[in-house]
Amino acid sequence: MEELTAFVSKSFDQKVKEKKEAITYREVLESGPLRGAKEPTGCTEAGRDDRSSPAVRAAGGGGGGGGGGGGGGGGGGVGGGGAGGGAGGGRSPVRELDMGAAERSREPGSPRLTEVSPELKDRKEDAKGMEDEGQTKIKQRRSRTNFTLEQLNELERLFDETHYPDAFMREELSQRLGLSEARVQVWFQNRRAKCRKQENQLHKGVLIGAASQFEACRVAPYVNVGALRMPFQQDSHCNVTPLSFQVQAQLQLDSAVAHAHHHLHPHLAAHAPYMMFPAPPFGLPLATLAADSASAASVVAAAAAAKTTSKNSSIADLRLKAKKHAAALGL
């Protein structure tokens, strides 16, 4: 009987103690997330203190004591220990901290460890751009081909035959001369360009030579403009001693053309003297222009002297004819 009374009192005291420890452990669990949110660095220490707190040890010991005692008090101890263990396993401060960190990492404004900073991206792009520029600057230099005299003679001979050889002719010529087909093709391209340049220069030279035949006639519109504007007027002051047969023929032809244009288009009559002769070509040396101007001045002086001589001779002829006529009439 005394043993039963002692056992009941002991189990009652143990039950009251377990209730107090359970209340204390519940308060610790509820205050854990708040402390973790305010003090992130101290959460792990709080979790360690909670794990090593007497409430946790009491919950484990209560479970063991309830299982060993068996009875009403023991059952209560087991239930308290199980509840304490379940609460501790479901709402651990460490797990709450981990969940809070995971939720904060999902927020759009929070920096992530996996994201690359923009500065690092810019540095990588700059480094890549510098590498690309270095590769473009370092280019392979073209090797210049030096043709022998025999190769040049063969190429020129084929170029005289045709300016555009086909692939078979280029291949045969490259095998015969020991050159690559690409070299032969490039040589023909350069040779055609050179030929076109020579033809253009020759054409320009022909035009300049044809224009130089009438260098002395370029001053005619400015010397005797009235004669060119009125080609069919036979006044004595409009007659100019011809410098040469070619100049006279050219002036007559231009006068006829100007007269025809005057009837067709009256507004072109004023511009006729300036449209008859081509303009002097550009790009001539200064020495050539000076020589041309000197020759033109000498031609003008000779024309003026010839005109004066012709006037004097015509006056003398008229006087001689007048004397003869007077003698014939008996005056």
From Swiss-Prot:
SMART domains to which the protein is assigned, alphabetical: HOX
Biological process terms in GO annotation: cardiac pacemaker cell differentiation; cardiac right atrium morphogenesis; cartilage development involved in endochondral bone morphogenesis; chondrocyte development; embryonic digestive tract morphogenesis; embryonic forelimb morphogenesis; embryonic skeletal joint morphogenesis; mesenchymal cell proliferation
Map out region (Disordered) in residue numbers.
27-140
What GO CC annotations are associated with the protein?
chromatin; nucleus
Q: Where in the cell is it found?
A: Nucleus
| Residue ranges the UniProt entry marks as DNA-binding | 140-199
Motif OAR in this chain:
313-326
Q: Gly residues compositional bias: what residue ranges?
A: 59-91
Regions of compositional bias (Basic and acidic residues) in chain numbering: 93-109, 118-136
A Pfam family of the record is Homeodomain
Tissue spec: Expressed in heart, skeletal muscle, liver, lung, bone marrow fibroblast, pancreas and placenta.
In terms of one coarse class, where is the protein primarily found? nucleus
What keywords tag this UniProt record?
Answer: Developmental protein, DNA-binding, Homeobox, Nucleus
A molecular function GO annotation:
sequence-specific double-stranded DNA binding
What family does the entry list?
A: Belongs to the paired homeobox family. Bicoid subfamily.
| Function field | May be a growth regulator and have a role in specifying neural systems involved in processing somatosensory information, as well as in face and body structure formation.
The molecule here is called: Short stature homeobox protein 2
UniProt source species: Homo sapiens
In the UniProt record, the gene name given for this protein reads SHOX2
